[in-house]
Amino acid sequence: MATLPPEIIAAAREAERKWRIPASISLAQWAVESGWGRHMPPGSNNPFGIKARPGDPFVTVRTREQDRDGHDYFIETAFRKFGSIAEAFDAHGALLNKPVYARARAALPDPDRFADALTGVYATDRGYGKALRAVMHGSNFCQYDGAAA
């Protein structure tokens, strides 16, 4: 089990308190999306792969995506640039509170069902929920849930 930097745990717990998204979900997405913090778009402070909207500060990166049939393809993508990791966790919580993620939120308080409901919505990878669950349980991230209580 990897040791998490204290600022990552604190950011996930604060996002849970504010947005009611389990810290275990945020931590698993941080680990999966950024390779445990090692593979963020350079200069972005964006461990979640959050894409930039018009007017957002951004960095451009070539990414691998997956179509509905499971075939990989590559695109140039503008990722949002954040001032800090804590700001990224806050934006991640806000993002998961958008209507497109209502089905995932309806699965709460079960983080496993929430993770599965993100497949095909948050990420194109058909094994996304399974990957999140493996990280959540393999790293005991559920121990950090409960900041919202």
Language model region names:
Residues 1-149:
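Catalytic cores of secreted/periplasmic lytic hydrolases that degrade extracellular macromolecules
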